[in-house]
Amino acid sequence: MADKHTSDGRNGFNGSPLDCEVYVANDFTKQEPEDQNLWSRPLARKWIVMLFMGSCLLYCARMAMPICAVSMAASFHWSKIDSGLVLGGFFWGYCCTQILGGYASDKVGGERVLFMSAVSWALLTACTPLLAHLSSHTLALMTMARFLMGVMQGVFFPSLASICSQRVVEGERGFLMSAMASGSHLGTLLAGGMGSLMLDQYGWESMFYSIGFLAGLWALTLWLYLLRGTDFSPKQTKTSCDLHSRLSRTPWLSLFKKPPVWAMVIAHMCLCSSFYTLLSWLPTFFKESFPQATGWVYNVIPWLIAIPSALTGGYISDFFINQGYGVKLVRKIMQFFAMGVMSMFIMPLSGAVTYPTAVICVSAAIGLSTFSGGGVNVNVQDLAPSCAGALFGFMNMFGALSGVVMVSVSGYLIEVTQSWANVFSLITLVNATGLGIYIIFGDARRVDLEDYSQVIVI
């Protein structure tokens, strides 16, 4: 028997996920594990590689329009307001399908939802240049295309959370989610680097064609080698039917009455707000504060740091859980690094700093923020594995909304005060608030069980 956790009532588990037995507190009815839902280790490795590539291409497709916006504006005579309308369309579509995508993934399997959405946004990406030249109403067509891109991509991370909760043992979820985050950072880098070269050499259309083709090829590979002929509907053992029926009757309202759920959502909102603000305003900060600096340095180095940082954070969280440390303790420590230690590197930017110091601080802050992959981002699978996709979608929707609000507030502060210190102070305050709430109210015990107080894995 594995060593017991002491911080949150869970037990460590170092062996195969197929060797575990599940007992439910207050009932103590022995139940068979839902073994057929879990990936074998070789299959898990294949999925990690494919999902890493998928998240990379997802962000390449997402970044294509922002990178090409200047060239497209020149070609179609868009104003700044027109460009903003097109780019903003993605956000509204992205928020629309977060909960729906997660709910569908929980019911029919996240693999199916992810594949169907990938085919859709790959096709739309490849067809974007054709739509742009289809009629004289280019602005309306591109705004609608951008909105639909958000709708199609909005299901990706909720479906990923659902997949992770259903197919991956608890002690390996942090690394999977962190690997997906590192793939998104790589996609941002590739879109900014290779995309800019293609834009200059072959025109803006080439970027959409290339990314759409590669994304379609990825979806085809996913279907041929991992999806075809496989039933991905969540399976249940005979002895787990009673538990499932109770979970099915659990109202959503009961989840929203749980302090750990709101602590997780608020922490995610605060971190998303800080991250989106840095993502949006750091290039302007460097350009205004260090006008002689080389642009590729501060645009590339932080994201190069973020890739190994995300993988390291996920590995560390899984390592300590498998060593027998409490899941709640590990999640809070990872979130402390993602928000608390990150803020320690943001605070110096409020004063006078040299260019090398600013690059180091920003790179460290961006890198540390990825540790959330072993904290709040995977905590939803601890709290409510039966509806992890839908709950993650709810959390991610509010994260995106809060991010847009804080980006706008930061722009207002910069315009009114003509100072960057207020923005970095605001980021620090928001992070401290979210972290404090999560440290006090956060938990890792299941809250989606109507009649049970906790689940103990032996």
Where would I find each of the regions flagged by the language model?
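Helix-loop-helix hairpin linking two adjacent transmembrane segments in secondary transporters
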Residues: 180-231
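Cytoplasmic helix-loop-helix junction between adjacent transmembrane helices
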Residues: 143-184
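Extracytoplasmic
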Residues: 46-80, 278-283
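Cytosolic juxtamembrane N-terminal segment immediately preceding the first transmembrane helix
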Residues: 2-60
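Hydrophobic core of transmembrane alpha-helices in multi-pass small-molecule transporters
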Residues: 124, 138-155, 345, 356-373
